[in-house]
Every structure is written in structure tokens, then in C-alpha cells.
Curated annotation (Swiss-Prot):
Pathway: Amino-acid biosynthesis; L-lysine biosynthesis via DAP pathway; LL-2,6-diaminopimelate from (S)-tetrahydrodipicolinate (succinylase route): step 1/3. The gene is dapD. This is 2,3,4,5-tetrahydropyridine-2,6-dicarboxylate N-succinyltransferase. Its main location: cytoplasm. Substrate binds at residues 104, 141. Homotrimer. Transmembrane segments: none annotated. One of its GO terms (biological process) is diaminopimelate biosynthetic process.
Length: 275
């Protein structure tokens, strides 16, 4: 365990005692170092190690502690003002820094300090919370919310109104993860630490949490908390055992590999689900 991690772990055990007035200099410096590291991509709350996603709980604890050490303060936002504990990521950015980091930010997009935005990303009017990681080439479309500590892969398209759940409210054990080369359809919600593996296509209006049945119609298998790589998923329902009613589920209607996904349009994939 690193010294930085040990400071965070110890502080978290006495978090109820920590306020902006009582926090000691060492703890405050450690928390601020973590937030700065998350902000620039040095740290990630979750990362893939040997093919499996691993959550670094101590980094998540540092994010939670950051709310304990700061008072609300006035935040300028061009035509308006805000009053919050967490600074905005781009508050001190210059044109040169935007050019250097290589992403686009459309007016009204909001990103909290402590979230990482990689190059070639486009942020339409959307919200990215503290601790989130948005990787290269991703489109974050209008009214998307990327929750605290959520992990978004490379070349992902988060369509209009998509919600990616966070870990802070309500408190979750693990962040929601969207793998590389995924398409998440408009108004869909992926929450509660669900993992959408690489190359998935999620249709419009699909809601997936840890208790959602994810039914593979080809195999009859039911998954929870994980959408297998290359899945094309739509909303559906499954009948109860006695046939008296049906309950919502997500249905894997087909699987596609990266080559097919690259050649075939998304609309074509979704319009041929009855084959």
C-alpha cells in the first residue's frame, strides 16, 4: 500500500470527523493529489487488469472525502453562477490548453474537476461528474449524464439523454463501465456498476441495473450485471412462471464481431432483430 493510499484509507475511517475546518494538512494534500490525478488521467477508479475490471476502492474513497474538505463556493459559469463544493474542470483552461488536450466542449457542457476527458472526445451539452473517465474518440451527446467514477471506453457513442450511473448517490460498490466501441442508444440507462463489454450496441430506451435480467434469446442464458461483448440489446419482457404476467428485461437479440460492427450500420443491426 502506498503512503498516499494509506493516508486516504485512514482518513476514510474517520470521515465523519472531517470538515473543512478540522481536516489536517496531510490529509487535505493527499485528497487534492488524488483528485488532480483523476483529473489528468494519472489515476482511474477502475481499470482492466489481465482481462478483468478492478476497482480501486481507495480512489473512490478519496472522491467521497473531497466533499468533506471543501465548503461551497461561488463558481462563475459565463451567463450564470453556481454554488458548490467541487470546482469546474475547465474553470482555468486557456485556448492553448484546450488545443493541447485535443477535445471539443460545446457550450453548456459541464464537467466537474476530477473527471478525465481524453483527446478527440466531443462533449455536447452534457454532465460529467467527478472521478469519471472518458476515453479517446468518444461522443457524449446532448443531455447525457456520466455519473461519478463511471468508466467510458474508447470510440463510444453515448446518445442523447443517456444516463450512466455513478457511485456516490446512492453509494455503489463498483462504478458503471462501458467498454470500447460501444453504442448506447438514446434515453437508455446503465447503472449500479453494470459492465457493458466491448463492441455492444444498446438500443434506444434500454434500462439495465444489477437486478435486470439480460436474456440471450439464442442460448436461453440469463446474465446479471454484465452485457457480454458484441451483444446487440433491445428492451423486452419475460413471462412469469405461472404465465399471469410479464416483467421487463433486456434481450440480447444477436452477437456481432468487431469486423461486422465496423461494416454494418447501427440502424441495420437494430432493424434486423427478427431474423
Amino acid at each position: 500500500m502506498s503512503n498516499l493510499q494509506s493516508i486516504i484509507e485512514a482518513a476514510f475511517e474517520r470521515r465523519a470527523e472531517i470538515t473543512p475546518k478540522t481536516v489536517d494538512a496531510q490529509t487535505k494534500a493527499a485528497i487534492e493529489e488524488v483528485i488532480a490525478g483523476l483529473d489528468c488521467g494519472k489515476y482511474r477508479v477502475a481499470e482492466k487488469i489481465d482481462g478483468d475490471w478492478v476497482t480501486h476502492q481507495w480512489l473512490k474513497k478519496a472522491v467521497l472525502l473531497s466533499f468533506r474538505i471543501n465548503d461551497n463556493q461561488l463558481i462563475d459559469g459565463a451567463e450564470t453562477k453556481y454554488y458548490d463544493k467541487v470546482a469546474l474542470k475547465f474553470a482555468d483552461y486557456t485556448e492553448e490548453r484546450f488545443q493541447q488536450e485535443g477535445f471539443r466542449v460545446v457550450p453548456s457542457a459541464t464537467v466537474r474537476k476530477g473527471a478525465y476527458i481524453a483527446k478527440n472526445t466531443v462533449l455536447m451539452p452534457s454532465y460529467v461528474n467527478i472521478g469519471a473517465f472518458v476515453d479517446e474518440g468518444t461522443m457524449v451527446d446532448t443531455w447525457v449524464t456520466v455519473g461519478s467514477c463511471a468508466q467510458i471506453g474508447k470510440n463510444v457513442h453515448l446518445s442523447g439523454g443517456v444516463g450512466i450511473g455513478g457511485v456516490l448517490e446512492p453509494l455503489q460498490a463498483n462504478p458503471t463501465i462501458i467498454g470500447d466501441n460501444c453504442f448506447i442508444g438514446a434515453r437508455s440507462e446503465i447503472v449500479e456498476g453494470v459492465i457493458v463489454e466491448d463492441g455492444c450496441v444498446i438500443s434506444m430506451g434500454v434500462f439495465i441495473g444489477q437486478s435486470t435480467k439480460i436474456y440471450d434469446r439464442e442460448t436461453g442464458e440469463v446474465h446479471y450485471g454484465r452485457v457480454p461483448a458484441g451483444s446487440v440489446v433491445v428492451s423486452g419482457s419475460l413471462p412469469s412462471k405461472d404465465g399471469s404476467h410479464s416483467l421487463y428485461c433486456a434481450v440480447i437479440v444477436k452477437k456481432v464481431d468487431a469486423k461486422t460492427l465496423g461494416k454494418v450500420g447501427l440502424n441495420e443491426l437494430l432493424r434486423t432483430i427478427e431474423e
